[in-house]
Amino acid sequence: MAARRLFVAFALLCGLAWGPEGASADDRAIVLATTTSTQESGLLDHLLPIFRDKTGIDVKVIARRADEVLDGARKGEADVVLIHARPQEEKFVADGFAAKRFDVMYNDYVLIGPKSDPAAVKGKDIATALKAIEGKGAPFVTRGDRSGTHAAELALWIVAGIDIASAKGAWYREVKQGMDAALEAARTANAYVLSDRGSWISFRDRGELDIVVEGDKRLLNQYGVMLMNPEKFPNVKKELGQTFVDWLISPEGQAAIAGYKVDGQQLFFPNADKSAG
C-alpha cells in the first residue's frame, strides 16, 4: 500500500512537471531572436505576457545585434526572428532560412545632438545634416557594432554622399556597443548620434541632448518577423512559432503593439501586411 502511495505521488509530480498529455513546459515554449534595441525598449515585456495569457505559450528571448541574430538563426538557435534590417531579412528568406517575412510595425530613427547644435542641423533633412556634421567635424558617435541601427546609419552616410569608412579625425567615434551606451557616449561628449526613437524616449539621463532631425522618410525603421524554415531546421516548433507570428500580425497583436507607450508616447506603430513576403 505504501509503495502504491509512493507511485501515485511520483505520478502526480511527473504530471506537474510535464503537464497534460506528457508535454513539458519547454514543449510549450518558443525561442524568439531579436535585437537589443527591441528588448531594451520594453515592448516585449508588454507583449509577451499578453500572448502567453492568450495561448499558454511562453516565449524565451535572445537579444543580440542584428547580424548576430541572423548568424544564430542560421545555426537553428531560434524558432522566430524579429528584427529591423530589411535587406538582410529579405536575403535571409531568399537563402531559404525562413519561408516568408511579414511587416509587423515601424518606428523611426532620429538624429540626436547637443542643444547648442554646433553643426547647425536642426530642422534639416538627414542628408544635409550629415553633410554639415562631417564638414564641421562636429563630434558624432556611432554604435559601430554591425547592428540594424548601425547599418541604417551607414546607409544614410551613403545617401549623404560621404565615404564614412575613410573619415579622418577624432570627430567620428565608435563605441562598439548598444544604443544606450551610444547615447551615453554622445551625452558625455556633447556629440551627435543616430538613435531609434524608442531608445531615445526610454533614455533618461539626456543632459544637453535633444532631437535635431526627425520626420525624414529616409529615417523609417521597419520591423519584420520570420518563422524559421522547418524544412531546413526540423527542430523548429513550427505550430507554436506560427501561432506567435499570426498573433503579432493579427488585429489583437497589432492593437497590443499600438498600446505600448512610455511617458504617454507611442513607441511602435503597427503596419502588418499579411500578404507580404
What are these regions (language model features)?
Residues 25-58, 62, 67, 71-77, ...:
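Exported/periplasmic ABC-transporter solute-binding proteins
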Residues 106-108, 137:
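Residue-level signal for tight coil/turn positions that link beta-strands
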Residues 111:
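Serine endopeptidase catalytic core focused on the charge-relay Asp
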Residues 19-25:
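Boundary at the C-terminal end of the N-terminal hydrophobic targeting segment
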Residues 1-3:
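N-terminal secretory signal peptides that target proteins for export/translocation
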Residues 80-106:
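Acidic, polar ligand-binding/catalytic clefts
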Residues 8-18:
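Bacterial N-terminal signal peptides
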Residues 23, 101-104, 132-133:
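Short, charge-rich binding segments
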